[in-house]
Structure formats: structure tokens, C-alpha cells
Amino acid sequence: MLKSLNARAVSLVTWGIEHSEELGLLTEKHPTGATLIDLGIKAKGGIAAGRFMTEVCLAGLGKTSVTTMSYEDVALPSIHVETDFPALATLGSQFAGWQIKTSDYFAMGSGPARAIALKPKELYQKIDFSEKSENAVLVLEADHYPTEEAVKYVAEECETTPSKIYTLVAPTSSMAGSVQISGRIVESGIHRLTELGFDPKKILYGCGYAPIAPIHPRAAKAMGRTNDAIAYGGVTFYSVDSDDDTKLKELVHRAPSSASKDYGRPFYEVFKAASFDFYKIDPGLFAPATFAVTNIRTGVTHASGKINPTLLKQTMQLVPA
């Protein structure tokens, strides 16, 4: 039987604290007693910190590596992610599905603490999973450390004390932040297939890669680039067990970002046109550029989508020397 998600993540976090100098992390005790790990606010962070953050988000049930990939005539650093526990690692842990919202703080939360608090409950019902754990590991995309009120809220939702909370935090406009968002490539595809009606428990294996967006000092621009990295450069592969190959083919056809009505412009432009309201954006845009899904019952691989180097160059402001 697998060790609990939070127990696995605590083991990783403990290792990270021991190697904080190599990873460029800063660790301190929060006023509430929680353990705070900074990967890019005051800390230097970096690519290794981003990989570490990604693997903590996956609760140790996925592996990452960074290499350079060619997107037609453009070569970009890219993160590769793989997992043999796709639904549990991604939807059960990595998915940024918890809004940490108090009177003095806001951030999107991911990581295995979600499995204790069941955020969101409907998603955990789909994967038939929940967890009880004294320790809780939460990853925040934020420009500021969580406030005392925010940490106490998390502890209350996880039915534990603040001293048992481990919080990792990095801004989108940091190297670690950019790496870990591109590191959601496999998760974004699984979430999209799930939203289209596929049972995530039937996904047996997942891997993929996406370019790591160059850092932009403006948070909104950085967020746009990181979303574009997945939507216009993200490549995914899955093995599934489906008894309906015709339906699977239809779902895969609808899954890539190119099927979205908002496809074809940098995300920042789409976001701005939507008055910076995520809920006005077609959910189909939050998907990888390509899918390849093999049905182990038939041996058929259904493929869809396309890489868009032109949009990648535009959003990342790649200017020839």
C-alpha cells in the first residue's frame, strides 16, 4: 500500500531543507509555527528548486527532468514529467484547486494538503480518494508569504495545528515558479480529459514536456507566458484503459488547446480582453498543445493538436540577435 501523499511530500520537503543551499531555498519558522520554504520571493531559487517544487506538488509520485527541446526553429529549456500514478499525483495533489482566501491574503494552493481538506470535493469524488494526515504540505503560487490568518485557515481546513503545516511558496515571475507551472503539463491534460467526461481512474500512465517560460518581471505577463508554454508548446502522452475507443477518439479530438475558441492569441491578450476574469475565458484553452492517448485494450493511439512555434516566439519575445 502506498504511503500517504502528505507523508511522501514531507519526506521530500525534509530532503529539500537538508539541501537548501544547493536548491537555493530559504527555510524559516512562520510566526504560527508552520515551516515556510521560500523558493523565489527572497530566495534565489532556480531550475533545481522548480523541479523540487514540482515533485513535491506531485507528492513524490512523479519524476522530472530538464533538457532542451526544439520547437521547429526554436530551442527552449523544457521540463519533462512522468508518473505511473496519474490521477492521484496530478488531480489528487498537483492540481491548483484550492483558493487560499482570507481577509489579508490570496493565493492558489496545490499539493497533497488538498487531499485532506478535499479542495475541491467534486474532484476527489471523481478519483475516489481522501486522506487523513497530521502533517500537511501545501504549495502556493504567490508573491508574498502567507499571513498568520492564512496559515491558521489552512490548518483548520486540514484539521491539524499550524506547526504541522509545511508551506512552499514561489511567485510566477520567478525561475522556480516558471518551472513548476510548466511542470503541470501532464496534470493539465488529465484535467482536460476529466472535464470532457473521461474517467481519470482509467488513465494508467502519463508523461509530457513543455517549454520553461522566460521570466517576466510583471506578474500578469509572467502568468501569460507560463500558460502559453503549455497551450502552445506542451506535449502529452497517456496510456488508458477504455472500453469505448470511438468515444475516446472523440474526446482526444476535443482535448487540445487548439480546439478552444480563445486559441490563437497570447494568453495575456485573452486575459486582458476578458477584463482579467478567468471565468470569462474558455476552459478549453487551459490544455496542452498536443495529446497522444494509447488505449491498451485496442493498441490504438489517438493523437490531436499541434505545437505553435509562432505563438511561443511571440509570447516569449524571442528576438533574433
List where the protein language model places each region.
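Anaerobic metallocofactor- and corrinoid-dependent redox/one-carbon enzyme cores
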Residues: 1-158, 163-187, 191, 195-321
